[in-house]
Structure formats: structure tokens, C-alpha cells
Amino acid sequence: MTQAEEPRLERVVVLEGGISSEREVSLLSGRGVKEALASKALEVESWDPAVDSVGGLEEGAYDAAFIALHGTLGEDGSVQGLLNCIGLPYTGPGVTASAIAMDKELTKNIWRANGISVPAGVRLTAAASDAELERAIAEFGADGVVVKPGHDGSSIGVTKLDRDALSLHSLRAALNAAAERDAAEVLVEEYIHGREFTVAILDGKALPVIEICAPEGSYDFQNKYYTDVVRYECPAKLPEASAKALAAACEKAFAVLGCRGWSRVDALERADGTFALLEINTSPGMTPHSLVPMAARAVGLSYADLCLRVLGLARTDIA
């Protein structure tokens, strides 16, 4: 795969910005996508749901929409439903798959039911009792826990507590921090102290596996987007059989959720060499630090051609 087939599109709208905590990242992604598509002689405009009216989408006479929104509205099925109603083809998964993927616990349950390994954990709220927290520590805290919002992305609101730092007090503080991002649902999961990987899926097929080598395992929001301290290995230095197994698991994870177009799946390696899948990103970042473009480059696909490939897969849920 070295060349992107240019879709027969002339007028495209890039959806960017939005109202989520990932707004600034979305604007960075949108800027890159707009420049790339314009370089391919497409007429490109932008639409920001935080400031622009729905009428602008309806009246734009666009051939397709490239969704560069992240988080609420952009990845939860909301904007996908709107675009279905308008009849405007869009990039990425449809309404149902997007809504499911936004819910980390529901996603894990579906994956687990389909034989895909995921971290053990429990879903709580900020109102969880001390007894519930103590039970979570007893059941999942042998090596520490990871506390995260049930629906947010970009590692926002995530706290990692290793075994020495884990206590009722520290878990309560982490729970409250995550609940500030997602009052409805917080996940407390086992802390898997292993290598971190991500796999981009394009049209149902995995691109080369990327290993994320963050300082002290801290692949947080700041390190993801605003520093150069994280090192990446692409393709990851894994035995061939392990890389194939991880890629196959991620392709299956994409398929069983009913995804289409593109996505990115995050995973951790367990001590026994197997992998636990963490979550799926249905509108992956396209910033200068983003990982899908990195994986695409490894197979000879430029940023601009990647944008065209993704755009060429634009669909609606309505036949």
C-alpha cells in the first residue's frame, strides 16, 4: 500500500473544534487535515459545532465530511447522527459503533464477550462508598490501579496509582479527579505494568504496530501533544508472532464493534507476553504528534494521502 486512490470528491467540510476537553487537539487535527486536502486540489471548508450552525452543513453542498472532532459530540455518535439526517457521507464509524466505543466499560464488555483480553476492573461513580473502594483495592489492586473517566479521551483525568501509592485516600482523590471529567462513570482497573502499544486500523486492516515509550510510563495529555520526550518505535520491536497476534486482536476489536473507515486501538503487554486492549479511538488525532500518520508513513503513505484514504471511506449509516 503505497498510493492513495483519490476519491471523486470536490467539496469537503472538515469538522473540528467542538465542546469537549479535547477541543484544542481537535483544532490541531483539523488544521492538518484541511491543509492536506487542500494540497490535493480539493475545495475545503471547516465547521465547528461550538460556533457554527447546522444550517451551514445543510447548505454547504459538500460531497463529504471529514470528522476531526474528538470526544463529546465528535466521537459519541452525535455528529454522526446529524450527518446521517443530512445525508452527508462522513469519515469513521457510524452512530452505533461510535456511541459504543465512547463508553469504555461497554466496549470492554463486548470485547470480553468476543474473547478479547481486557484489563480487569469495576465501574464506579464519585458517590462510591469507602466499602466499594476497599473492595476495588482488594480485587484489582495487587499491582496498583488505573483510574480513568468512563468516556473521556487523550488521557485526561487519568491517575495511575502503583501498589505503594494505593490507599483508600489516594483512590478517593483519583476517583474525584476522574469524576470532574465524567460525573456519570469512573473506571478503576488493574494496573498492568507493561509495554504500551497502539494499532491504527484503516479499512479494517491493521497498520504497523507502534510502541509508545514514555518517560516513567507517563503518556499523559502533556506528553502526547506538547512535548518531544516520548519515543516511538514503528514498527514496534516485537517478535513477528506477537505483532501479528496484536494486530489480529485489534482488527477483531474494530470489527466486533461494527466500526468502519478507520480507528486506533490502544493496548498493554502483560508479563506473560499477551496483550490487554484498553480502548478504541474512532476519530484518531491527526496532529504533528499523532500516531496514525506515523503508522501510515511506515507503509509509504504520506499524511496527505492518508487523509485521502480516510476520506474515500466516508459513508452514512443510511443505504
Q: Model segments located where?
A:
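ATP-dependent carboxylate activation and anion-phosphoryl transfer catalytic cores
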Residues: 2-7, 113-115, 239-319
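A short glycine-rich, hydrophobically flanked beta-strand micro-motif that places a catalytic Asp/Glu
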Residues: 45-50, 186-190, 260-272
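Short beta-strand-to-turn element immediately C-terminal to the catalytic PLP-Schiff-base lysine
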Residues: 124, 158-165, 201-203, 270, ...
